[in-house]
């Protein structure tokens, strides 16, 4: 892209010199997008033109507890004000991890909230995953919960989790079935055999330093990647650990989100931008290339290859197939985008779901909808 190359520690770092981008998409689709996002200010949804011709009735809401620590002016029609994690299980149910309202399950007919009365004592959920037996695992700031469809079981210090504050995207079930848990004080692995015998079933993964883990993922080759807020990125191939940090030409030691594109490249978010790693070369994109905001933390790559990046103050849509500077489209508060995006998820049908500080949004590839308890859940 007309950049310049620097060599550090045997690794090539590419930095772009493209001038800042001020361009915004001026299509009808963008106008629709920005108008809908303005509904974060408390307006009703449905400023996208026509709503679905035959919307399905809203689901039955099942909630047997009073939400904790919610603002007096909290909009009770929202699925929840803060949605920190989103996941779709093997049965197609969508799960939403919230702050102060536990976890909610949507199965097309009901929206069910689970909290203290159900044995799910903690109300803030930062990570969700499913194991090979169909159990759901939830990461909270009070340890891990396993849900077998009937009963919640909590794991904490007594089970070997010396640190019980689970990271965002801090639960991974790898291809072999091993369950990894990232905390703010290291990474742990779960031993189901020890659990069945009533012993300590979580043990510290000692091949890693005691990192402040910001996320765990498995790539297409079966390597496990760990993002940290203080030591860069680590890759584990089943035998050895490789650390990619400042000394290896990563521009900083902070890494937040991780994703892998269709070509096998790894992408990392950092405080000052995002970085693509092809196994040899690190290519960095910053505000000079068109990224908006500061302190980049979330990243997801759609099945189509479109990359979404969340940051403090903005969200950026990045199309790698388009030459810079036109590859980036930034949405900020100036565009009416006042919602702080806290989670992004693409379901099996390809629809994109956005958890924000002002509720839930759905993006079907063409339009954005704010999804409240009564919908619209489907387009």
Positions of predicted regions on the chain:
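Carboxylate-rich, polar loop motifs that coordinate divalent cations or form catalytic acidic clusters
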Residues: 1-379
């Amino acid at each position: 892209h007309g950049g310049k190359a620097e060599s550090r520690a045997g690794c090539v770092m590419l930095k772009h010199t493209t001038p800042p981008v001020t361009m915004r998409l001026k299509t009808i689709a963008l106008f629709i997008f920005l108008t809908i996002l303005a509904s974060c200010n408390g307006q009703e949804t449905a400023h996208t033109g026509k709503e679905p011709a035959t919307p399905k009735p809203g689901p039955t809401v099942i909630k047997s507890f009073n939400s904790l620590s919610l603002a007096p002016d909290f909009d009770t029609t929202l699925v929840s004000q803060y949605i920190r994690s989103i996941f779709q299980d093997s049965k197609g149910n969508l799960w939403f991890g919230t702050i102060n309202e536990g976890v909610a399950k949507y199965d097309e007919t009901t929206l069910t909230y689970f909290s203290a009365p159900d044995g799910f004592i903690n109300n803030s959920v930062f990570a969700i995953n499913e194991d090979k037996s169909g159990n759901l695992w939830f990461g909270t700031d009070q340890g891990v919960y396993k849900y077998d469809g009937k009963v919640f079981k909590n794991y904490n210090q007594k089970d070997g989790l010396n640190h019980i504050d689970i990271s965002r995207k801090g639960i991974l079930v790898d291809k072999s079935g091993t369950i990894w848990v990232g905390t703010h004080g290291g990474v742990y692995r779960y031993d189901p055999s020890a659990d069945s015998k009533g012993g300590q079933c979580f043990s510290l993964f000692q091949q890693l330093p005691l990192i402040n883990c910001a996320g765990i993922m498995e790539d297409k080759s079966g390597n496990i990647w760990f993002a940290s807020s203080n030591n860069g990125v680590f890759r584990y191939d089943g035998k050895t650990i490789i650390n990619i940090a400042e000394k290896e030409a990563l521009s900083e030691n902070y890494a937040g989100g991780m994703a892998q594109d269709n070509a096998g490249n790894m992408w990392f978010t950092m405080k000052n931008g995002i970085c693509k790693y092809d196994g040899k070369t690190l290519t960095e994109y910053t505000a000079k290339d068109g990224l908006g905001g500061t302190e980049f933390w979330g990243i997801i790559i759609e099945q189509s290859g479109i990359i979404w990046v969340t940051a403090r103050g903005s969200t950026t849509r990045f199309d790698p197939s388009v030459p810079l500077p036109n590859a980036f489209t930034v949405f900020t508060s100036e565009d009416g985008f006042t919602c702080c995006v806290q989670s992004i998820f693409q379901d099996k049908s390809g629809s994109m779901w956005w958890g924000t500080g002002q509720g839930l949004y759905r993006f079907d590839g063409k339009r954005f909808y704010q999804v409240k308890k009564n919908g619209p859940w489907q387009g």
